[in-house]
Amino acid sequence: MSIKQYKLYLIDLDGTIYNGDKKIEYAKEFVDYLNANNIDYLFLTNNSTRQPKEVAEHLENFDIDTSEEHVFTSSDATKIYLEGKGYKNLYVIGESGLKNTLSSFNQKENEDCVDAVVVGLD
């Protein structure tokens, strides 16, 4: 297999590695190639319902051998953004993946007296 060498591959998931519950042809071979050749990559997803470990486990359903260190979710991006802004108190609407990723913040039960409202679901 001849693949142009880059320092890093940023790879979307749904529609690129899998399509819903279907494997995408050659996705496994591509990731296997990256792993075998020690090429850095990061799976990106706008799905906030799972944490990176859960995403890596989900990829096993498609025979993709990876780890949570190779997954970056929209929840991760949200956490970094909120930390950079210095926000502490959040009202979070979403699934456990989002809420768990943001667990270092004070999550309030209602939107009164919060710095930010975070909504995520996919």
Where are these regions (language model features)?
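HAD-like aspartate-dependent phosphatase fold
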Residues: 1-13, 17-122
